[in-house]
Amino acid sequence: DVVGYGGSPVECVDLLRENGIPCLKGNHDAMVAHGNQVAGRMKLMWDWTEQQLSFEQRSWLAELPMTFELPEFQAVHAMLPMPEEWGYVLTASHAAMHFAYQTNPLCFIGHTHSPAFWIEGEDREHEITSIEPVFLDRKQLINVGSVGQPRDGDGRACYVIYRLDQQDVWWRRVDYDIQAAQHAIEDACLPLAFAERLSRGK
C-alpha cells in the first residue's frame, strides 16, 4: 500500500511518481482511488487521504497494476489467482493455493505487513534468516514485509533485496523516524491507533 495508513500520502505518491518507481496496487490504494463503503476508523483514514490527493494523484493510484512480471520473478500485492479479492497468505494451505497459480519460480507479495518465506511442498512457513538462497527448481513465495506499517513486532522498516548475481534474497531492517510519522498522523487529527501501532510494530 502506498497510502491509507499514514499522515503523508501526498509525499509518498509523489516520491514514487517523480522517480518512476514501479509499483503495484494495494487494497488501501484501491479504496482511496475507487471509493469505499466501509465504516469506522478506516473510513476516516481513507476519506481523509482521498481529500489530500489531487485528481492526478488519485488517477495514478487507480491505474497501478495488480501484478508485475519479469523473466526473473513476478510480484503481486495479495494472493493469486484473484489479487483483486485481497486474499492473505497466512498458512501453508494459503501458500499452496497461491503456488497453483504462480507462473514463475519466484514471487514477491505483501499485504500481511509481515515478512515471510514459503517454499512449495513444505507444510509450514520457512524460518527466515537474514539471507535466503533462491532455488529455481521449485516455487518460492516471499513476503517483503512493510516499510511504513510493520506488523511482526519489529517497528523498523522492512524490505528485501533480490540479488540476481548471488541468487539470494536479503531481508533488511532499518530504523526511521517513527515519531515524525506519528506526529504527522496526530497533526491530521486521524485516529491515534494508527500512530500508536507504529512504535509497537503491530
Segments predicted by a language model, with ranges:
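Core catalytic region of metal-dependent phosphoesterases/phosphodiesterases
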Residues: D1-A62
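His/acidic metal-ligating clusters that form di-metal
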Residues: Q52-I119
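Short amphipathic alpha-helical segments
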Residues: V10-E11, N36-Q37, G87, I119-E122, ...
